Amino acid sequence: NGGDTFITRANPSLTAIGALGIHKAGHLQVYAPITNENIYTNLWKGPFYGFERAIETFELTNAPRRIKPVGIYYHTYSASKPAGLKALHKVYGWALAQPLHPVFTSEFIAKVQDFHGLALAREGEGWRVRGSGALRTLRLPTVLGAAQPERSRGVAGWSEGPEGTYAHLTGGQAWLRAAPMQTPAAPALRDANARITHWDMQAQGGEFQLQGHGPLEFSLHLPSPCQVRAHQRTLAPQSSPTPTRTDIRHFRLNDVTARIQIHCPAR
């Protein structure tokens, strides 16, 4: 609870975004990502459809930089008013249409704890990262470019953002090297709605494992001759999420966990 993040288009100020948590007596109290329907509805005095503005909060805490996750937080009495119930349907419908990585609240808490204790240090031509392994995504400012998975350790890939790139780590320890954005020379992860539990990749291919809470979706930076397999069958890519980038291919599986192989014939 707490934090009361309530940024909206009517009040698009960073001062309306609460912290991830607060230290008290040697402990870290983790706040809810955003406030609940009470604030959006003037302490449940109306308008009872006010919680639909949580969508504005989700959008404004994701761009131009990701500050908070999508956390749908409300009391069950929200469904006691038709307008409140309609607002819930609208918020859930919006969330289901987004490319999100679902996690339990307990997993989010672990990520916030890792955020507060993560260590970053310059080491040689890269950056040393040490944490608990709960937090797996780091935002690199534009000046650093993008992670180079093939020249790093503990880095699975990266994705673009409006204010930099996001590096995907495979665990709590990594050495990350960055350079101006370019197509990876070896297979790399662009995004996924699940957690990486295993990653072993070379220029000729390799394998990785994803563990999620729903049907798996993931995108890969892939050289054109590479094939992707799971459950002893070749996976057919879905329509590209970025039509102008032929090296990016998107895949879907009905499983919540899968070990995926990539094979790249010699060129």
Q: PLM features: residue spans?
A:
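Catalytic grooves of carbohydrate-active enzymes
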Residues: 34-110
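Non-catalytic C-terminal accessory domains or segments of carbohydrate-active enzymes
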Residues: 94, 99-267
